């Protein structure tokens, strides 16, 4: 078909045919695999426990976090890996979370930005708050995990392997919870929201947005950098006393650009790995 200048011919073709539909997706850099977010069944409805009451709308609730704003929690999003041959998705898939009953991406606002492919397509960094019930309701302690496709193993990048989360004490305020005492002790266990990982272009680092304290949904969002070779973590926006609303790596892997608001004006800033910050945009 002859096309005039600036015209593009699109050919639409269905690539997937999955029973659960597709909530979101992200192709690997080599385009041989794809992450697909499916909704999977979570918990039991009354009719599941009492099949003879197939018309019941009642619910048996014995734990917290049974509802998100305008919807009952009957399904949760989870990431599945499919092979892709350039034409269609494979019929077989692997759930990154295995049998774990957790959300990924996290509700209510999380999307595909909470998962990232490594540059060599061999690993996936993902965001997850691995809690249920009351602990899920009261805590904002999500972490960044690294999943290796070849071995099927998962590593928590935020906490040591022997970390055990303290029990939530309903008689204490959020500030006085044992989990937040780690901060006073100088232990950086990333006990607040940790979200939206991104690999550096050279593959040496993973960055993510990080809140310091557990239970504080409006805590300051910082940029945390994780060095894959050493396991060291450090923060590069400590001199910026406001939120990191969004960010991306520069091609040199030594600079990150981020969007932040200062004095009621939103601008683009840049920081290097030493935490030296400069404003890129000006005006209002």
Predicted region positions:
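Residue-level detector of Asp-centered blade-edge/turn motifs that repeat once per structural unit
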Residues: 29-30, 119-120, 201-202, 251-252
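Hydrophobic beta-strand positions that form the internal "hydrophobic ladder"
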Residues: 34-35, 124, 203-206, 256
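Predominantly five- to eight-bladed beta-propeller fold
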Residues: 39-99, 127-130, 134-145, 173-178, ...
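Short glycine/acidic-enriched loop and turn motifs that connect beta-strands
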Residues: 41-44, 131-134, 212-216, 262-265
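Surface-exposed loop and turn segments in beta-propeller and other repeat-based domains
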Residues: 11, 93-108, 155-189, 234, ...
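Beta-propeller blade signature
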Residues: 2-4, 77-85, 141-151, 222-229, ...
């Amino acid at each position: 078909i002859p096309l005039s200048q600036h015209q593009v011919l699109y050919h639409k073709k269905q690539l997937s045919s999955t029973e659960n539909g597709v909530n979101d997706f992200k192709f690997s850099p080599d385009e041989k695999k794809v992450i697909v977010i499916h909704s999977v069944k979570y918990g039991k409805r009354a009719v599941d426990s009492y099949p003879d009451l197939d018309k019941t709308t009642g619910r048996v609730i014995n734990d917290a976090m049974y509802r998100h704003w305008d919807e009952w929690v009957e399904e949760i999003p989870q990431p599945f890996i499919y092979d892709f041959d350039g034409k269609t998705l494979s019929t077989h898939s692997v759930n990154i979370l295995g049998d774990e009953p957790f959300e990924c991406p996290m509700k209510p606002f999380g999307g595909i930005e909470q998962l990232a492919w490594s540059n060599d397509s061999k690993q996936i960094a993902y965001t997850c708050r691995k809690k249920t019930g009351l602990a899920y309701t009261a805590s904002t302690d999500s972490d960044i995990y690294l999943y290796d496709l070849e071995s099927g193993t998962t590593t928590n990048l935020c906490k040591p392997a022997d970390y055990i989360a303290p029990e939530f004490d309903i008689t204490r305020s959020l500030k006085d919870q044992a989990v937040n005492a780690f901060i006073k002790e100088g232990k950086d266990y990333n006990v607040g929201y940790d979200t939206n990982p991104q690999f550096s272009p050279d593959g040496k680092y993973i960055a993510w947005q990080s809140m310091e304290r557990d239970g504080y949904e409006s805590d300051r969002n910082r940029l945390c950098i994780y060095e894959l070779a050493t396991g060291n973590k450090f923060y590069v926006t400590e001199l910026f006393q406001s939120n990191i609303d969004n960010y991306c790596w520069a091609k040199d892997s030594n600079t990150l650009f981020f969007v932040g608001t200062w004095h009621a004006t939103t601008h683009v800033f840049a920081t290097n790995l030493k935490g030296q910050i400069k404003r890129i945009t000006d005006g209002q």
